[in-house]
Amino acid sequence: MRFRIPTTLAAGAAAVLTVASLSAPTQAAGDDPADLSPYLADTLGGLSGTATVLVHGATLADAKSAVESTGMATSITFDRIGVVGAVGDRAQIEAVRSEPGVTYVEGNAPIELFQETSNIATRGLEATRTLTGANGKALTGEGVSVAVIDSGVDPTNPYFAEEDGSSAVVANLKTVCDPFDFACTVQEVPNNVDTDTLSGGGHGTHVAGIVGGRPTTLTDGAELQGAAPGSKLVSLSTGAVLFIIGADAALNWVLENHEAPCGEGVSAAECPPIKVTNNSYGPSGGGEFDPQSATVKLQRELAAEGVATVWANGNDGGDGSESLSNPPGMDPTGGVISVASYYDEDTGTRDGQVSDYSSRGEAGDQSTYPDISAPGEDITSSCRPYLPICSTGLDPRNGPGATDIGTFNTISGTSMAAPHIAGIVAQLFQANPSATPAQVENAIKSTAYKYADGAAYEQGPLGTTSFDKGYGLVDVVAAAAAVGGTSTATKAKRSKGKKRGQR
């Protein structure tokens, strides 16, 4: 059965993650007030109470001084990019624009979640069975952690069960903002606690399973596995109030902790460094790319430190007459990868269709095109029947255990395409641990399979690309060869755990 309706929730009606539609304002000069982000410019005039904003400074000290001088309350600081999250009324927000050293004031826009034989279509299953990485082990993403920034995760889902009974989720965190003193912090949660319980609940659990679900056989005989079934998962829930500050706080946590995500003293074998983040959220209707946003500043710092960033391109469809792509995914920085949704027609074919809901870029402006396509339609992964997004799948299926009732479901969206790429990035870093995020991105794009559906391809920097599907369908085997470090296994060992092949 084909589910072509992507899981997309409206902010307010149901909790959804939506990145602010941000333009690219210029830095304030001289005595001119600092520019406002488009979202804040649109909403500030009607503000009657207080609002959270991101105050960007030429330095962190400038941003802190401006917030203090105007009497605003600090909620969080992003030390590495010189940004302070602060709460104030309309007059204070207007005043902070004119404080010395303030370069930009960004609104705390709401964010929205973007919602198989898929690993056959990507040749990912073939790669896990026939290739080995630089460590001599099957190419499963082993030795790499993937940070999933989303609604949270249920780490007890059977899809995450290791052979020893532990969970593939090695770190479980949540952004918490205190409604009384406005402070926002990223807090550690016990690994057996389900953080995916918001009104958007289920999205993060489903996404995490697509990244790194362990080989599992469902009671109906279906065999599933995630894109990188040997990777470890670090879940960062964006908190109970879904706004951009929560997602940025999660990215900032990764920036500060990617080398040892479980803390000092925990071995890399148990909890490997984070090498890629998955971000399956964005603004409804796309928006202009904003290089001054905190999101972009954070992902550029991550790239410089060897961490790739993967974005779902959005679920707004389009015809190429305008860009509906997710703004931060348009970042030209190497290692920032935007993903369109591909439909393999439930057969594993590599000559399927670009999903009709997958957001298109603007024809002729390659800066707005998605980078790559990956399966995002009819994807079966971990879920729970009581979680709202899981219930939209209408195809609950039982896991291997007697109590694993309805622990899997089938959902569609670019949210499901992006984690395929995040898992594949983990595989490629296992193949060549010394590769840079830019080299990994180039390997993925330059080796993509040119499926014919949709818009015609045109010449791009790394071959041919198109406004709807980017460079084509990801090819894991070819990308692994391009990034280097792999060898062909005589008999690659299947990932430990139960059987499963990401349907």
Which functions belong to the PLM regions below?
Residues 28-29, 132-246, 268-275, 303-306, ...:
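Subtilisin-like serine protease catalytic core
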Residues 1-28:
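Secretory targeting and sorting signals
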Residues 38-43, 267, 271-278, 374, ...:
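C-terminal subdomain of the subtilisin-like protease fold in secreted/lumenal serine endopeptidases
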Residues 59-62, 81-83, 91-93, 109-113, ...:
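Solvent-exposed loop/turn segments at secondary-structure junctions
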Residues 212-213, 422-430, 481:
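Short glycine/serine- and small hydrophobic-enriched flexible loop segments
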Residues 4, 31-35, 61-136, 142, ...:
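Autoinhibitory propeptides
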Residues 170-179, 330-426, 478:
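Extracellular S/T/G-rich loop segment that most often corresponds to the catalytic His/Ser-adjacent loop
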